[in-house]
Amino acid sequence: MAARSIALGTIRFANDAPFVLIGGINVLESREFALEVAGHYKTVCTKLGIPLVFKASFDKANRSSIHSYRGPGLREGLEILQVVKDTHGIPVITDVHSPEEATPAAEVCDIIQLPAFLARQTDLIEAMAKTGAVINIKKPQFLSPSQMSNVVEKFRECGNENLLICERGSNFGYDNLVVDMLAFGVMKHCCNDLPLIFDVTHALQCRDPSGAASGGRRSQVVDLARSGMAVGLAGLFLESHPDPDKARCDGPSALPLALLEPFLQQVKAIDEVVKALPTLSVS
């Protein structure tokens, strides 16, 4: 099966092409913060020759606690993302949570993302599809890999073929996630080899059953990223923070920003080795 390819300007997403980094922060904390972090990502990725799409959320609509920080909201958040895009000359991605957010988000962002918890919401899918934007579909934690074909089919029936699919772990008992390495191949097969992204940081989430926010295992991010890259991915989804312990959301899963360059050096090395190997089919 030939790998599907999705173009985003000069960036090409395909499972047999050099990987693209969808990297950034979990949630927008301020304009200055977003510009600073995006600038660091651009510097590192330019040095290493890694295509970059900068990620940030304007609203974390699915926080566990009503008291948790959600973000600046749609209007201010999109204004910040536009400034980041214009200042650094890099494409941007954000997630949307309601049909009304799809069009304004697509007017600013190069990719819009369907959150994992909302991946079966048909009205939202239809609104996102109609924008014509490239869509990153997060696989829900509760959905089997093969069931992603139904989500993909909804988008196609709504007229959008510009699709990326994203693995972010699966429920393993209560309050825990695991990444099934066999799932990558299943998702590629059932979705006709659409470009596959691996969200390594959200896959590290592990909840305290009595806690009001998600915990995480960022000490294992290198292990998980190396493992994921070995299956041949179109892209890696990564969130970083200069001080993860002070992050407004998902700090326990975030890579310390100071480690971005050595981390990506290792990831790129594995990607290059894997994609230089001949295809070996086992029936």
Swiss-Prot record:
InterPro entries assigned to the protein according to its UniProt record, in alphabetical order: Aldolase_TIM, DAHP1/KDSA, KDO8P_synthase
Q: Name one GO biological process term.
A: keto-3-deoxy-D-manno-octulosonic acid biosynthetic process
Q: Which UniProt keywords apply?
A: Cytoplasm, Lipopolysaccharide biosynthesis, Transferase
Coiled-coil annotated spans: none
Report if keyword Cytoplasm is assigned: yes
What residue ranges are annotated as transmembrane? none
The annotated pathway is: Carbohydrate biosynthesis; 3-deoxy-D-manno-octulosonate biosynthesis; 3-deoxy-D-manno-octulosonate from D-ribulose 5-phosphate: step 2/3; Bacterial outer membrane biogenesis; lipopolysaccharide biosynthesis
Listed GO CC annotations: cytoplasm
Q: Name one GO molecular function term.
A: 3-deoxy-8-phosphooctulonate synthase activity
Q: Which reaction does it catalyse?
A: D-arabinose 5-phosphate + phosphoenolpyruvate + H2O = 3-deoxy-alpha-D-manno-2-octulosonate-8-phosphate + phosphate
Kindly give the SUPFAM superfamilies that the UniProt entry links to this protein: Aldolase (SSF51569)
- Do you know which Pfam families this protein is assigned to? DAHP_synth_1 (PF00793)
Where's it found, cell-wise?
Cytoplasm
EC numbers:
2.5.1.55
Its family remark reads:
Belongs to the KdsA family.
Q: What is this protein called?
A: 2-dehydro-3-deoxyphosphooctonate aldolase
Q: Which organism is it from?
A: Prochlorococcus marinus (strain MIT 9313)
